[in-house]
Amino acid sequence: MTVPATTKDPRDSLLDSPLVHFPSLPRDSYLPHPTEHTVVSIDDEEILPSTRSSLHDVLQVAWSLVLADQTSSPEVVFGMAYDGRTTDDGEQAIMPFRLRLRAEDSVQEALAAAAAVTLQMRQWEHMGLRRFSTMSPQNVVLCQFRNLFVIDHKDPTEDCVERSCTSYSKGYALTVLCEIVDQVIHVHAMFDPLVLPPGQLRLILHQFGDILKTCLRGPPGRVKDLQQIGPDGLNYIYEWNRGGERDEGIVCVHQLIEDRFKQAPFAAAVCAWDGALTYGELDRWAKRIAAQLVEAGVKPGSFVGIYMQKSVLAVVAMVAIVKAGAAFIFLPPFLPTVRLQLMCQRTPVELVLSVATLLRSASDLSVPVQVLDYRAKDEEETAATSGGSEIAQPNHPLYAIFTSGSTGEPKGVVVDRASFGPGVREYCRRAQLGPNSRLFQSVSYAFIVSIFEQLISLALGACICVPSEEQLQNDMEGAMCRYQATWGCMTPSVARTLKPERLSCLKTLALTGEPVNQSDMEQWKDHVNLYTLYGQSETGSTLLINSITGSLADSRGLGRPSTGACWIVDPEDPTTLRPLGAEGELLIETTALARGYMNNLEESARTFIEMPKWLKQLRPQGHRSRCLLTGDIVRYYDTDGTIRLLSRKGTGAKIRGQRVELGEIEHHLRPKFPDARHILVDVVCPAKAGTGHSILVAFVHGPWKDTEKTGELATATSEFRQQARRVIAELRQVLPSFMVPSAIVPLADVPTTATGKVHRKSLRERMSALTVAEILAYNQEDRSAYRAPTTEQEALLLSICAELLYLPASSISLDNSFFQVGGDSLNARQLAAKVRSHGFSLLATDIFEASTLASLASRMRQYNQTDSEVSTAPEGDPFEGLKQELLGELPSSLVKENVEDVYPASDMQARAIRTHMLDYFPFEIKGQLDRHQLQHACETLIRRTPVMRSVFINFRGKMLQVTLRSVAIPYKELTIPTGEDPLSWARLHIAEDKKKTAAFDRPTIRFTLCRQSLQHHIFIVRLPHAIYDGSCLEQVAKQISAAYNAQTLPEAPDFAAYARRCARLRTPSAMDFWRNFLAESEVTRLPHASKGDEVAVIYPGECSPRSPPPGITMATAIKAAWAWVLHKRTGKLDVLFGQVGSTRGIDIPGATDIIGLCLNITAVRVQFAGLQTVEDLLRMLQQQHMRALMYETADWTDIVANASSWPEGTELDSVVLHENFGGLPALDLGDAIGEMADPIFSLSTSNPLTLVTWPSTQTLTSFLLTRENVFQKEYAEGLVTEFNQTLVQFLDFPESSLCSISTCG
């Protein structure tokens, strides 16, 4: 259902934006099992409104807001039920409830919108969910909600709520039942814990209760006020942050280090590749250098650079600078000179400490250089060695570090001495880092972690183990063992290169900088104490450390801060706290924060913000805490205050509206590529793909042999492509479709940042330069290289293929088939028609049979239109005799002079008439409309299009189509009552019109203009399905638009010419083909529960299959999957069913533009004996389709009567219909535009079962259409599930044997 609006209003149109269903399922085929139940109660006699309806609106808006926060989408959909309200069949009424919430709307507007949806829902709920879904394919999608919201007013004496909640919950991952008893609301939830963790659900229910109480106590002004945290949520957060107000006072790390010099002078301080020092030795050497620095003019507030590789001397230099009262900045030699120069200028650096071997490059920094000598270690102390640390103040800088800036230039962060010290002892206690620890210092000096670990180790008396760069690159494990390292900190990417069983000395490992996945935990959990570490350059000594005990949930938590408190605020408004469970930006409150950014007051003010008002009210006056906006998006995940990191602000990984855990995908990929050095997954926006179009891409860095490379990318070999396709197929079995990468790309090298992290942005940018086709080509079968056309036919064919497939002609090889370059059966028909329009003949069968485009071009011959033109002269008209017979016995409803043409209705037309198929297409028109001109356009359409003037007559047991010379133009105007939503009112008008029985012996086409204002109309076109199909809707819209704008379109072929051509194709050879095709066969029939009622029902499903193998169309794959389902369900090795196919491939010029019903049902037969693999089945069906193309216009009744041994009237039991035409057309009406809203269809149930499928960008929607009570509900749902699973398996593993295919339908 939709909120009152128009298609231009973002609240409207069932499919104007992708629905984000909540909760997301572990995989597409997962069936929820709601086994857990929980309840919370809201008890406040003063807040409940006096009327039920107003309370219902509040409940619905509150639940919508919760879902909006969970999905990060303003538009939500859920199932809605009022306990005890029933359908016409006496079942509990459940309907979809779709609502778009806008933060700036008033709450009253939101409540009114919910009330309007409820009113609209009341008008349809009598139908029930299944019948409602049959109104249009869009409704099928809408009805696939995953959570159900129930409102129930209970008598206080009743006590059956849990049973009631259980009865509702079947099939839904989450059911929330609001039981209202007197002045108490009991909120019950039944849920599947494998889909929705209990902790997350508890937060959801608390948030729901908070919103509800806030709204009921007196609705605040705007919706955004309801999206803030409520009183109960505040109490939780205050409790979690209890202790955050504690102030340790002035604690400076340099003082802690000085204490260690005095307390343990003989303890090991540094053990490096180039030497070792005790704390006493380190103290003495650093003092001498500090004295030299003071002599050179260094003072508190000065910055001194350290231009050295990892070494014992670098540690000494760092301590010496601190002792001199100055601040240090590491200048790693591997960074570009230009960047280092910029860092020196921005800081500014007064002096650089280096070594003799680096003197030449150090001189390029344009800063005075002082060379340190290892021999100075043993020199006698001279005089003043106390340095300047005694006069340095807490507000003097301790160090500076540069991070990546959003502008592309490095951003300098300055940390004061007072900002590094608070929380150090607490951090070490939690991280098990103490005087006996030996810390392996592997992290680059460009990474803030290197500063954290060195300063904290020295402050606690640990030993810093410093390997050489060569040891880190070539033998990291050996170095850790030689130094007997017990404590390490590194990124997960680095840790994955190590073997824990070889590191018996290592006791503690902290992972930082990147997400930790399940594989990381499994790798290390039995060998070390495993932690995650969170900190930023701006956080000083405020670090968050989290102990991982073995579950994935543990690894995603950030832990608690070593000092201060964590809050989650609105990313757009940091003065607002986010509700429990909602996403927001992490704000850290602490006394240990950086001073700010160098020479960037504006950026500092945005990041280091004043304490928000709500926080000031919690803290005593004069409290020293400051606040940092981290830029990280997080959320609470349980009622214990666990915070989970989701993404960086503005760069969250989302696909199809769903947040994607990239680490989880990487975890599943890692066992598939056991020799890979790195496995990465990221979201890529391909070139020329349009705004917002993104795909998932996996990157595998492995020991590829014999491959070329382009930058970081390696060339995909045939073996790699085959492996990648197999891996993607396997991932589909364990992950939801939106988490399966579209492509796997081999890497020759992994780009890294200056800090040693994987440079994901570099990879994204590299891939974003490629088109979708170029990215997908990494996993496709080999395509031939481009070969320029040499003939007129080849050039024309390439040009038409490029136009149809939206590909550059240079990317299409003449040595590939039409299907290898992206064509399908519909494109094939369009290709044949376009080739004919250019003066060449080409049959659709040629396209299917030709192995290459070159061979297809060779089949093109000059086309002589006169050879194929169908004459309508009496002597050549196969229907002239029929016309004369009808005129001799003309029904009273017709006038002889008004009869223009007569010919038999096709089987499809007759079915549409028998089942009263009338469809409605509402166009919402915005802008200045000339109503008279629109009426004239409708008259022109009728006049120019004979099929629009057709009626249908039963004559001597046959259905005839009679074209009239003139008809009264069925056009009328209505006025929409004031205050009514235009589209809602129009849909109700359509619903009333559908109740009337149409007489098809009179024109049934209707045009209705519903006027709300001069600028706003709804234009309804009613079409009997007997005179149109989906492929010609665009042509109908073009004809109306052209006539309105006084333009002339080329004459389109008349449907009568099509009918006559079909009649001429009914040849003896056609009947012979079908006779041989059906020999010794029988229609495959599924077990029916009953003949069923006339009411149509739909059982929906969805899957995400891969593209079929080259030369196979998706329609063929769908038929193969359905054939397999029939085989498995019936046990028959010879199955027969029907398919609905377009017959626009007929050899009439311009057949694609015919307005009329150009569809037919033909038979599909599969004999499984002799078929070994899935690909055997696919190839057999594709070849069968090609052979039948010449005879596809034969009517089923004709085939049964003249080409089978079956009784007259034998019908197919099941029929497959694969819809594959474009989007909804629009009307161009001068200054106004008419956009088609969701059509309302009448669905045919002439066959017991029709399987309907239609593709979208990344999914295939399917549904079974049948009559009510033909099948048991569980059986029908099992059929569609089994079909979807079979199709995915067939296309994931086309080379697999058929006997290995298993489904759980």
Swiss-Prot record:
Function: Nonribosomal peptide synthetase; part of the gene cluster that mediates the biosynthesis of hancockiamides, an unusual new family of N-cinnamoylated piperazines. The NRPS hkm10 and the NmrA-like reductase hkm9 are proposed to convert two molecules of L-Phe to the intermediary piperazine called xenocockiamide A. Xenocockiamide A is then converted to hancockiamide D via a series of hydroxylations and O-methylations.
PROSITE patterns named among the record's database cross-references: CARRIER
Organism: Aspergillus hancockii
Chain spans, region Adenylation: 278-672
Carrier domain residues: 788-864
BP GO annotations: amino acid activation for nonribosomal peptide biosynthetic process; secondary metabolite biosynthetic process
GO CC annotations, alphabetized: cytoplasm
Reactions listed under catalytic activity: hancockiamide D + (E)-cinnamate + ATP = hancockiamide A + AMP + diphosphate; hancockiamide H + (E)-cinnamate + ATP = hancockiamide G + AMP + diphosphate
Family indicated by similarity: Belongs to the NRP synthetase family.
Protein name: Nonribosomal peptide synthetase hkm11
Ranges where the record places region Condensation: 926-1166
Record's keyword terms, sorted: Ligase, Phosphopantetheine, Phosphoprotein
GO-annotated molecular function: ligase activity; phosphopantetheine binding
UniProt xrefs under Gene3D superfamilies: 3.30.300.30, ACP-like, Chloramphenicol acetyltransferase-like domain, N-terminal domain of ligase-like, Nonribosomal peptide synthetase, condensation domain
